[in-house]
């Protein structure tokens, strides 16, 4: 059973990576090492009180499994209260409330396999892909990794020195392909925007689609969609494409701080009132949902239940639970794939009850 409790962790280090990003390392006491054991590509949910607000945000782990460290990369975001606070104010020795690692943005390691893994990253989307890349190179000695990495310019590139060190260590197994939107390079392929056309150029030349065993995509919302479309058009099977989303599509001119959670609306067919049983840590608690409440997550929080959540936008998947009984409708879903939905998993921050009786388990995640 995956823990969804917060634990106080001491900040070991806050290291500047670029002018807009820091790397935060945590000290994990011996009694919590099992709880904070992670799989490459997973994320941590941090919690903090900032200007009187109880905020939670998820940040991807950037360490490989063999690094012996727990660390995340945090980039400043225009209007992003938590990320900007971390960059400006978090210090070594501070204590942060941290939830155990979560996420399914990975493929199990196969030490004996000879596979070609491809990462397509944009900006801070490199963070989970770096974790995957380091782990694959260390634990699948016959496999190779190709990274297509988009940024505005070299100076704003996160983890550039660490990635170059990896290239020097795995010269025959790691291929790095940088793309800059604001800085020309010697190769026309290396200049431009990470859209479907640009990624398609790579798939038709330097990174033949037929050679790809698994592709990992993480970056801005539109880049994710366009990279997926390019891979599918090139013939990469859908089940070999893995996507991690950090946010929703922003309207033109909007900032991350201006676009919050989705506006929920009751629809015909939604239950006007429902009895919801919440299962967490083996305990059951019944609450009443009324039509005016935005979601089951909101109803649970209003009833005083401590339930896991982070973005409340249907993106991160922290609020995921298993539908044991009844039927719900999700407003939107960017975190669960079709197999997970078919298996009964829902995002409680987006869920409205349809039946008058619903049982949800946070212990089955």
Model-based region annotation:
Residues 1-3, 10, 20-22, 233, ...:
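Iron-sulfur (Fe-S) cluster-binding modules
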Residues 84-268, 275-277, 284:
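FNR/FR-type flavoprotein reductase catalytic core
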Residues 269-312:
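C-terminal accessory/binding modules appended to enzymatic or scaffolding proteins
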Residues 40-42, 60-65, 290-296, 335-337:
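A short, sequence-level motif marking secondary-structure junctions
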Residues 2-95, 99, 112-115, 151-153, ...:
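Ferredoxin-reductase
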Residues 301-303, 308, 318-365:
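Iron-sulfur (Fe-S) cluster-binding segments and ferredoxin-like electron-carrier domains
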């Amino acid at each position: 059973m995956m823990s969804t409790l917060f634990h106080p962790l001491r900040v070991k280090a806050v290291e500047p990576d670029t002018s807009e990003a820091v790397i935060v390392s945590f000290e994990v006491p011996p009694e919590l090492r099992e709880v904070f054991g992670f799989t490459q590509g997973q994320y941590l949910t941090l919690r903090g009180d900032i200007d009187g607000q109880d905020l939670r945000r998820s940040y991807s782990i950037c360490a490989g499994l063999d690094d012996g460290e727990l660390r995340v990369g945090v980039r400043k975001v225009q209007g992003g209260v938590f990320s900007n606070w971390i960059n400006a104010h978090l210090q070594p020795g501070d204590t942060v409330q941290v939830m155990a690692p979560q996420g399914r943005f990975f493929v199990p390691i196969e030490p004996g396999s000879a596979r070609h893994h491809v990462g397509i990253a944009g900006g801070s989307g490199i963070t989970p892909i770096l974790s995957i890349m380091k782990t694959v190179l260390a634990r699948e000695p016959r496999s190779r990794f190709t990274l297509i990495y988009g940024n505005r310019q070299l100076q704003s590139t996160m983890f550039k020195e660490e990635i170059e060190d990896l290239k020097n260590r795995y010269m025959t197994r790691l291929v790095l392909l940088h793309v800059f939107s604001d800085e020309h390079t010697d190769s026309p392929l290396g200049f431009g925007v990470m859209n479907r056309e640009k990624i398609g150029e790579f798939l038709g030349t330097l990174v033949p689609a037929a050679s790809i065993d698994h592709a990992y995509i993480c970056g801005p919302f539109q880049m994710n969609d366009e990279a997926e479309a390019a891979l599918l058009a090139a013939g990469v099977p859908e089940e070999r494409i893995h996507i991690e989303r950090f946010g929703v599509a922003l309207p033109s001119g909007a900032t991350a701080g201006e676009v919050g959670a989705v506006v929920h609306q009751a629809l015909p067919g939604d239950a006007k009132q429902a009895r919801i049983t919440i299962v967490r840590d083996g305990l059951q608690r019944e609450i009443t949902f009324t039509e005016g409440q935005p979601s089951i997550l909101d109803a649970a929080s209003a009833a005083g239940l401590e339930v896991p959540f982070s973005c409340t936008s249907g993106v991160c998947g922290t609020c995921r639970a298993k539908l044991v009984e009844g039927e719900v409708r999700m407003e939107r879903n960017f975190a669960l794939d079709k197999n997970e939905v078919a298996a009964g998993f829902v995002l409680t921050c987006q869920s409205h009850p349809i039946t008058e009786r619903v049982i949800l388990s946070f212990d089955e995640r």
